[in-house]
UniProtKB/Swiss-Prot annotation:
DNA damage keyword on record: no
Assembly notes: Part of the 50S ribosomal subunit.
Cellular component annotations (GO), alphabetically ordered: cytosolic large ribosomal subunit
Top-level division of the source organism's lineage: Bacteria
Descriptive protein name: Large ribosomal subunit protein uL24
Originating organism: Mycoplasma genitalium (strain ATCC 33530 / DSM 19775 / NCTC 10195 / G37) (Mycoplasmoides genitalium)
HAMAP family in alphabetical order: Ribosomal_uL24_B
């Protein structure tokens, strides 16, 4: 089960981007990686398709995937990171499960 989902606020806990935070844009479950907004940017050079002989390239930057074990969920109310441990609470009005942090009982 993946604890980190699309739209979650996460913090990088190891590596060159340690301490950086952002929102998860996409989770790649088969590769066990996630793409985080503004973290792990790489430059990609793409050729223009104007004609076959043109050799112009446009450098653009985009986010590269990060392994999930380098990320931790961030509790915005408590202003601290939590590694894993999520429990579910059933909302009595809507009868739906909501994810909450086990340590602080704040909703994710």
């Amino acid at each position: 089960m993946q604890r980190i989902r699309k739209g979650d606020k996460v913090v990088v806990i190891t590596g060159k981007n340690k301490g950086g935070s952002g929102i998860v844009l996409k989770v790649l479950t088969k590769q066990n990686k996630a793409i985080v907004e503004g973290i792990n940017k790489v430059t990609v050079h793409k050729k223009e398709q104007v004609n076959k002989r043109s050799k112009q390239t446009n450098p653009t930057t985009k986010e590269a995937p990060l392994p999930l074990n380098k990320l931790a969920l961030f509790d915005q109310k408590a202003k601290q990171q939590t590694i894993g441990k999520i429990k579910y609470q059933i909302d009595p009005k809507t009868k739906q499960k909501t994810r909450v942090f086990k340590k602080t009982n704040n909703a994710i």
